[in-house]
A protein has these predicted regions:
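Active-site core segments that coordinate phosphate-bearing ligands/cofactors
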Residues: 1-108, 112-208
Length: 208
């Protein structure tokens, strides 16, 4: 929901500009973020929008989304890129807590429809990103799971091989990965330092 929320609340001008160019708003944003360097000129976004807070890689029901590092020199385009980067950093944060190295990630949902964002995921994770043809892939996964349980396929590999078709593969640009890794410690340190702020905020407005 992060891009949608950002567009709904801050994206009026962007939507107008995209309409004037007769462009899809997401295609237009992909063009714009290419004009901003890695690190979004120091703007950092933490994508904890859900009312229940964050569940991985840490659990904190009081965690809330925020932009940090904004000054008068920044523009909406910096904020847009920071939103893209923040979601990808959050995914990296989760994968770095897993016991084995992640060499390939299958991406689905809204982010998978965005070539620029899919490539950003690959560059930030330092892993190959695979997108899949089709829609409602979560529902498809439920159906395939049931099909394996019922014995229509002998295992998940057979089910996937028979029904899933790769749309595109994104290879990581390791030079860009190294640049992103300069900013990743800032992402983690910022949310660590915000935890006491989240706690105080929740107590003040009665969310505890």
């Amino acid at each position: 929901p992060n891009l949608e929320w950002m567009l709904d609340n801050f994206g009026g001008t962007l939507k107008q500009q995209a309409a004037e160019k007769n462009m899809n708003i997401y295609d237009y944003m992909e063009e714009l973020i290419e004009t901003v360097p890695i690190g979004s000129r120091g703007v950092m976004y933490h994508p904890y929008l859900l009312a229940g807070g964050e569940r991985a890689p840490f659990t904190d029901s009081r965690a809330r989304a925020s932009y940090t590092g904004i000054s008068v020199r920044h523009t909406i385009v910096d904020i847009v890129r920071a939103t893209y980067e923040g979601v990808a950093f959050a995914m990296l944060d989760c994968y770095q807590h897993m016991p084995q190295e992640i060499k390939q990630v299958t991406l689905c949902g809204g982010g998978a429809k965005s070539p620029g964002w899919s490539q950003m995921f690959a560059d930030i994770l330092g892993s190959k990103i695979v997108t899949i043809k089709g829609n409602e892939l979560g529902a498809k996964g439920v159906i395939l799971n049931n099909a394996v349980v019922q014995g229509y396929y002998k295992d998940y590999k057979e089910a996937v091989d028979a029904t899933v078709e790769i749309k595109k593969v994104y290879e990581p640009d390791m030079k860009k990965h190294k640049e992103y890794m300069k900013f990743y410690p800032l992402y983690k340190k910022t949310y660590d330092q915000l935890k006491e702020t989240w706690k105080l905020r929740s107590s003040l407005i009665g969310e505890e």
